[in-house]
């Protein structure tokens, strides 16, 4: 065989793996980039009948009040700290028409402007990014059935950032909110909103068809459940040992019960707190 022919044959042989790789990649479905990644759940907000009673209950769970906001001396919001980046916000009821129970969930992002642009480009109507009362960046968006959704980016000098490392109760029953249940009348439309427009993905480790994973590395979830008359919150907390946690709660005068084999608690307004065994990456100092 002539030398030039041998060279051509060897070159073709060397190129075959490249061609096969290119063909394999082109045969794969295009990746769904989805929403820009988020850091997870920043807070859940609850309207409460009695702020003092609700705060006392959550303090029994080990959650200290990091700070509060007021209007002319009247309390408007209390921030109970789960970890350095997650809070339970309690809003006292001031008007008869205000509904007790779940108000909204807030997701944290390190690139709030990018997230805002993403939603706007997907037919949603996020409000402009602004600096909120606690000093962080914030925008909101109307979800299915006119439900409010918040998005925040923690900023240097904000009340949340200044409090890092503080108010981390050593007796917290959980160091992480790993999920929140959102009630909807039209489940199908809510599922389409969160998966189709917000870029949430079905939680791979779950069989529940209406449980979706928040974009990003948090492994936290949003569960879409049928609308109930009481509008109560469903909060999912990660614990390391269910039996030990139940014993701790009993010692503090808080009784748990089981629903669908899952241990749950009720706060003074009937909001549901579900305890779930889950590996927790953070330590007690976070």
Predicted regions and their residues:
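Core segments of cupin and vicinal oxygen chelate
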Residues: 36-39, 45-87, 121, 129, ...
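Bacterial N-terminal signal peptides
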Residues: 10-24
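A short, polar/proline- and glycine-enriched secondary-structure boundary/capping micro-motif
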Residues: 65, 99-102, 161-163, 233-237, ...
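Conserved short beta-strand elements that form part of the metal-binding/catalytic scaffold
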Residues: 64-99, 148-156, 200-233, 268, ...
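Vicinal oxygen chelate
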Residues: 28-35, 39-49, 78-81, 95-176, 181-182, 205-207, ...
């Amino acid at each position: 065989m002539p030398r030039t022919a041998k060279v051509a044959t060897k070159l073709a042989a060397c190129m075959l793996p490249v061609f096969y790789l290119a063909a394999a990649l082109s045969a794969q479905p295009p990746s769904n980039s989805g929403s820009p990644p988020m850091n997870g759940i920043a807070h859940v907000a609850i309207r409460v009948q009695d702020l003092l009673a609700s705060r006392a209950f959550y303090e029994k769970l080990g959650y200290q009040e990091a700070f509060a906001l007021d209007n002319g001396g009247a309390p408007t919001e209390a921030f109970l700290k789960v970890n350095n980046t997650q809070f339970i916000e309690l809003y006292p009821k001031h008007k008869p028409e205000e509904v007790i129970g779940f108000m909204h969930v807030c997701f944290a992002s390190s690139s709030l402007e990018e997230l805002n642009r993403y939603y706007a480009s997907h037919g949603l109507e996020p409000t402009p990014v602004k600096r909120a009362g606690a000093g962080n960046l914030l925008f909101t968006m109307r979800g299915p059935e006119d439900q409010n959704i918040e998005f925040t980016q923690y900023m240097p000098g904000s009340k949340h950032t200044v409090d890092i490392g503080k108010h981390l109760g050593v007796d917290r029953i959980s160091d992480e909110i790993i999920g929140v249940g959102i009630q909807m009348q039209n489940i199908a439309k809510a599922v389409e909103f969160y998966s189709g427009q917000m870029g949430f993905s079905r939680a791979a480790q779950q069989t529940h068809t209406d449980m979706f994973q928040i974009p990003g590395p948090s492994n936290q979830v949003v569960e879409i459940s049928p609308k109930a008359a009481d509008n109560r919150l469903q909060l999912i907390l990660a614990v390391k040992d269910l039996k030990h946690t139940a014993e701790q709660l009993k010692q503090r005068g808080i009784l748990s019960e089981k629903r669908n084999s899952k241990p749950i608690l009720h706060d003074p307004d009937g909001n549901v707190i579900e305890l779930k065994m889950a590996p927790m990456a953070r330590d007690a100092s976070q």
